[in-house]
Amino acid sequence: MTHLLTIDPTLIDWSRAQFALTAIYHWLFVPLTLGLALIMGIMETCYYRTGKLFWKETAVFWQRLFGVNFAMGVATGIILEFEFGTNWSNYSWFVGDIFGAPLAVEGIVAFFMESTFVAVMYFGWEKVSRGFHLASTWLTGLGATISAWWILVANAWMQYPVGCEFNPDTVRNEMTSFIDVALSPFAVDKFFHTVTSTWVVGAVFVCAVSCWYLLRRREQEMARQSIRIASIVGIVAAVLTMTTGDFSAVKVAETQPMKLAAMEALYDGGEGVSLTAIAAVNPLEQPDYAQGGEAPLRIAIPNGLSLLATHSIDGYVPGVNDILNGYTRDGKRELSAEEKMERGRRAITTLATYRRLKAADATDARLDSLATQLKQDMPYFGYGYIKDRAELVPYIPVNFYAFRIMVGVGTLLMLFFLVIGHIAWRKDIPATRRGLYLAALAMLPLTYIASEAGWIVAELGRQPWAIQDMMPTVAAVSDLQSGSVALTFFLFLILFTVLLIAEVSIMCRVIRNYNANK
């Protein structure tokens, strides 16, 4: 794998850009699928319990919108998975035994579950019993959620690799415990934070569409009842998202301190570190960390970051310089960047020597000695591909502002749900609250921006790693011509844009043409 040190940098950039493009487009569809699945399940449950035709018509309406979005999510998701084999073949070879397992379970169990019951949900009205149809609706949503679980397990493993061991004979990482991978604390926190945030997206979407009807004084009963359900889902989901986000912050502080430092533009850490509310971080250039200091015009909450990251107001939080230079936390010394890079290069050299002697039928004692040395240095294997310590620092401005967009919009959404929920659960929703309805429409794009911002922090914050500390992106990429990757980037850009325009157009047509009295 040492030849990867000379790979074309533009190939890495185009491969990353293509994967980012696909992931961003895919994530436009996934949150609405999971969020609408919950809300339409609640609405059909109301129909099952009351027998009122109104609830059936309401559930059918939201199911139509769900179906359009579901199809787009599947299409973009399939392309995303194929990119691991086409653009990231070294990654697939190195950890395919581990990474492929949760994706295989997702495909065999969750996807088939969704595919089966979504057909019953759409075509089973008047053909199956109300109870079976209700079960199919809930199982469609459950299948989508299970699918999200296994995909997030795979992603969480990239952020915090556990349950595996490197085999020098095959030059691959092999799974040693499926349970450790599937039930990693990082995966559990990531799943609950992600899924509850999708419920927020679904609730905002329902409120926005319903408010569009109220603005035009159409389908007012359906709109009011939908807002009532969505506002409750939104309030509960927003609280859960904030709570699980707090748990995730602690895990990030423990396992990915550089990501946390990037989110905060924290150069020099310490105890009792303040949480930055806002600061004038230059969005166009990476700060000079060697000089230390802090961002100008900084407004901060005293001891806030220590409380968030360690649940102690005096907790120690390392900054970028601390991580690069080495630091001590809880009595444990963390190596400096140079020490990790040296250990990584030694691991690469040891592996090459092991394989050469293995091919030459060397003695078992010599091979065992090399294997022992390799095992000691393997936690730093990925650092051997890092040329300069500056590569270990994610791009600070994007992480800093994306995190604040996510948190800021999330806080705003909590207030939005409280206001619209309070109004919705009165006897009647006034048709004259035009400002509120317009605000609901404005919240929809903001919610999507915040949702995407969360994933930007999660993925860009761990750069330069494809797998944290184990494999940098420079070592994960396929040996392709950068021009071919650039070409497919623009082809996918056109394709995904057409798909997005098609979805929005179809949804708008469904919303405009809906008439409950027909």
Question: What residue ranges belong to the model's regions?
Answer:
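Polytopic transmembrane helical bundles with strong interfacial aromatic enrichment
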Residues: 1-518
